[in-house]
Amino acid sequence: MAKLKILVIGKRNGILQWYENILDSNDQSADYVISGFALNHNNTLERFLKKIIPNKDVYTAKLLEKKLYSFQPDLILIVDLFYFSPSLIKVLSKYPCKKAHWIGDFFDQRLAKSKEIIDLFCFTDSSFMEDAKKIGITNSLYLPLAYNPNIFFEGNESKAERLLFIGAWSPNRQELIEQIPLPLTIYGKGWDKLKKADSIIHPYNIPLTQVANLYRKHKYILNLINKKNIRQGMNMRCFEAPACGCILVSEYVEDLELVFKIDEEIIYFSNPQELKSKLKETIINARLAKDKVHYHHTYKNRLKTLVELLLDSKISQ
C-alpha cells in the first residue's frame, strides 16, 4: 500500500520551531511521508524575492499551488495561527484533500474566513473551542502541543537543584518571577528588564539544542504562562522538560489536568509562596511524567491522531 502524504504548512525559523519539529517527526516506519511548505520562505531565493515583489500573497499562493500539484497530499496540516489571503484560500479550496489547522494563539473573526475549506480546527488551549464557536467554527478539537524526542531526551548529567526558566519575557511573567522567593537562572530575550537578587539572567534567546542541554542539567524547570498567547493551555515546555527527566514546576492552568496527574507527576502552584513550600515538601517521581510524554505526547503521536481522525477510510483500504 502506498504511504499517505502529509503536507505541513507553517513558518520557518519561528521561535518555537513548531514547523521544524513536526517535519522532524518523519519516520520511515510510519504509514505516511511528510513534506513542508513554509509561508514565509522555503529557500534563500524566495526570501530575497519576497522582499522586492509587489504582491507577496499572490506569489506565495502560486508557489503553494505548484507544491500541491507536485506532492499531491492526502492531508494538509497548517501549524500556527495564520489568516489566509483570498489568493491562498482560493488555492487551498481547489484541492479536495483533508485539511487541519492547528492553532496555539488567541485569534479573532478573521479565522472564520477559512472555515469552509478547513475540515478540522485544532486548538492547543481547550478554552479556544468556545471562542471558535462564537465566530461560527464548530468543527474543532483540543490537541495540545507536544515535543521532539530527537532533541529533548534524558542524559546522564547530574542535575542542579536551582530553578531554571527559559522563555520569552512578558509583563505577567516578570510580575510573577519578582514575587518568587527563590533564586533563579533565566534565559530569554527581554529579561534584562528584570532585577532580582541572587538570580543569574541571560537576556537572549538560545537554540532548542541548548535548551535541551540545560534541561538535562537541572532538576526543576519553571513554567509560566504567557498570557498574551493563551488562557489555560500548555506550552511546549510542559512536555519538553519531563522528557529530559526534569520535574515540571508549573503555574496552574486547567489544561494541565487533561494530561497529567498533577499531584503525582508535576509540581503546580497558584502563587509564588505556594511554589516555595511545594518545592520543599512535595515528592515527585520524575519518571512518571517522563514515561507519559514519551509514549503519548510526541509530534508523531499528534500526527497519528489526525491521520486516524481524518484519513481513517484511506488507512483501512
Tell where the protein language model's regions lie, with residue ranges.
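Active-site donor-binding loop signature of nucleotide-sugar glycosyltransferases
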Residues: 104, 145, 168, 270-271
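Conserved acidic donor-binding segment of nucleotide-sugar-dependent glycosyltransferases
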Residues: 262-272, 278-283
